Every structure is written in structure tokens, then in C-alpha cells.
């Protein structure tokens, strides 16, 4: 089997270019993310696909579709135009955050579900399961804290003359907004446990990083909900866009870090699934009584 390491290095370089473009709010190359995932797919094919052979290409295809869909627009095309902003309705759009969460998490969730469903069953490693259970509790707990914090802020600061939305509508919108990210986090942790049970520790580390990506995605989904000002200014948003103070030179540090961690997760997953083979898969069993 030919070495695919140059493809993996090129994919990593494109991932760095993509994250750098997000960091400075000016794409280095608008095709960087698409090419990074395409090179990962080529690396998987060259290095040898695991069984079942369709799983890794199917997962990467979902990621490629999302990367093409969200590819930055060409700044040199399209005329400039005025945009007129009008005040919207006072009520909170209940589904705005949920739709934003699906947009952010659907491709990663599909990839994780495909790899989890296609992976062969192996024994559970109790220490790994225990760590994953703690991590899952943290993901769910963070989502609950965010919802409760918004609820308390909206309830404490609501004024009759504010003309804002009802507290129940606000809490419902935020509760729906966190669901896609929580689902991604739990699925990624389940995938990490399954891969660890197969002895694929590198790929398992990639799945853990994918679960970490769910946290800023959760805050971004809440940020898409048009909350009243008094409900939006809460201190529990540890992974929101302003968690790292932006600057003129680096206006988007949190989105850039999120993209870097996400693409690193994909690199580790693909490298761990298609790279090293387990000894039980690579070598035939020795006859009984024979010496190695």
C-alpha cells in the first residue's frame, strides 16, 4: 500500500489556512476547507479503507457537502448593494436557534453516526466508559446551565414596559437551540468509546475533539436566538464568540479556534481509522504450539 502521508500533510496545511482566514476575517483561500476534506478522502483511499469500506467515504462526503455549502463567497464577484434593516417582531423566534444548531452540527453529527453505526462491536473498556460518562455529564450540564441562566436573567429583569417576548418563549427557544449541539457531543463521545474499544486510540482522540466542538456550537446556536438584551447578557457563556477578546488583528478568535479543533478532529479520525492496523487484523493467528 502506498504511503499517503503527503496527502495528510497537505490536508493539515489547508486546515491551517482555513482557520487562519477565519481568525483574521479574511479567507486566505476560499477553497481551503473543501480541499482539506478532499485530501483527507484521498488519503483514506490510498492508505486503505477499514471495513466496511463505505463508512469513511460516506462520513467525509457529508462533511464535504457542508464545506461546499458554507464556502466563503468570492469577494471579487457580485455588486455592492445597500441593505435596509427594519425592526422585526418583538416575539422570540422559537426555532431560530434550533435551525442554526442544525446548520452548524448536521454534517459532523451525520459523520459521527455513520462511523458509530458502521464500526464493528468490541469490548467495553470500563475506565474509558467512566471518563466518557463524566464528559457527557459535563456537556449536558453545560447546556442545562445555559438554559437556566437565560431563564433566570429573563425572569429577574423582565419589565412590563419592555415590550419583549414572554419568558416561556425565550426559554423554549434556548432549550431547542442547544439540542443539536448536545446530540453531537453525546454521539461523538459514544464514538470515542467505541473506537477505544477497538484499540484505535488516535481516532478516539479525534472523536473526543469533535465532542469539544459541540460546546462552542452550543453557544453559537444560543447566540442565533434573538434574545432580549437583558436575557442575552449572561455570564455562563464560556464558549461564546467573545470568550476570547477579539482584536483588530484577530477579530474572530473563538470561531477560528473552533474550526481548527474541528478539522484536527477529522484528521485524527481519518488517520486513526485508515492508518495503523491492529495486530490481530494485520497478522494471521499462529497455530497452537508454534513459536513466533
At which residue positions do the language-model features occur?
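Alpha-helical transmembrane segments
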Residues: 3-20, 57-66, 133-139
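Hydrophobic alpha-helical membrane-insertion segments
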Residues: 59-70, 132-146, 204-225
